[in-house]
Amino acid sequence: METLPGLLQRPDPGALSAAQLEQLRKFKIQTRIANEKYLRTHKEVEWLISGFFREIFLKRPDNILEFAADYFTDPRLPNKIHMQLIKDKKAA
């Protein structure tokens, strides 16, 4: 395998047999379905992500990593998400 900058390696297209490739394809599909089901049943994930992006676009921080760390460790965040979930239930 060829090594790329940053020590990443390119995938070897001949490394898997046809049966293994088919098994991998099915696994990827099942994983996507499971992820979609999880996200649809956990509204709080949507609110975490949309709130995070909204704050990024509004504040446009210079240091995204620091901003993300501060955002997701904010002790008020669970309450904000909880309140949003309550608003959603009332609106439904």
Curated annotation (Swiss-Prot):
Organism annotation: Homo sapiens
Protein origin, superkingdom: Eukaryota
Protein name as it appears in the record: RIIa domain-containing protein 1
A Pfam family it matches: RIIa
Record-annotated RIIa domain positions: 43-77
